[in-house]
Amino acid sequence: MQPRFLVLLAAYNGMKWIAEQVESILSQRNVSVTLLISVDTSTDGTEQWVADLAARDPRVIALPFGEKFGGAARNFFRLIKDAPLSDFDYFALADQDDVWNGDKFTRAVDVINAQRVDGYSSNVNAFWPDGTQRIITKSQPQVSYDFLFEAAGPGCTYVFTRTLFTALQENVVSRFGELQAVTLHDWYFYAFSRANGYRWHIDDVPGMQYRQHSNNQVGVNRGVKAFKARLAQVFDGWYLNQAARIAQLVGMSDQPFVRDWINLGRVQLVRLALNSARCRRRPRDKFVFAGLCLVLALVKHKK
């Protein structure tokens, strides 16, 4: 029997690219695919397109329309909460605007079985309207607490075993109200998995073409403008406050390492800087993380 996949796709004003994305999902080789779509209230006809697709293709299920989520994370939390568990071996996430390689799922299954893991993600091949392409590498070796401070790559590369997805769904259902304050679903899903002892593998082989455009909610940090925007999120407290919130929601707030920094005081930020090697995967990010923590500690001291 072919592996059975349920793909959770979050859409919003997606008419420009959703057809190409859906075609690449439904064309996955040597697996059985069912596609579950949730549409954030749109103005470009996305709901009608999805409804028509679901009416003519039994592999496609549309969740009821009419909800305004205001962001991809809330849409994905809704998808996780409402996803049917029966009849599926694996569960995957999808954006509305990428293009998947035909062997994306067969490779994921092979890696999951070979590595004996419950969570899978991968590098991606990012591409821009001007024809530029670049491999985005997220497969640096995992460290003790990277999951509290970053995702395992783009969420559209994530694949969960039934065992992991069942546990994740139970968590999302029980924490649904609190999760509305979490901005990045892929970060949270990775954090939940690692915090609860599930093994995860980040594949160095890209399985998809990751489209970059002006409407990306979260994309590749490319250029000075994007870097400044990310830096502003760090200095206004969003980043570490999200880390603290995620640590609490995945049940790690009482862990000694987390207790040392979760209140984000000046001394705690210095401690966090000294532990940067355990907080980020990429060597450069370890140094940047330490520097940012020290700068934030200095800012708090001046206040």
Please report, for each region that a protein language model flagged, where it lies by residue:
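Glycine-rich, basic loop-to-helix element that forms the pyrophosphate-binding segment
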Residues: 66-85
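Acidic donor-binding loop at a coil-to-helix junction in glycosyltransferase catalytic cores
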Residues: 178-191
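Catalytic donor-sugar/metal-binding loop of nucleotide-sugar-dependent glycosyltransferases
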Residues: 191-209
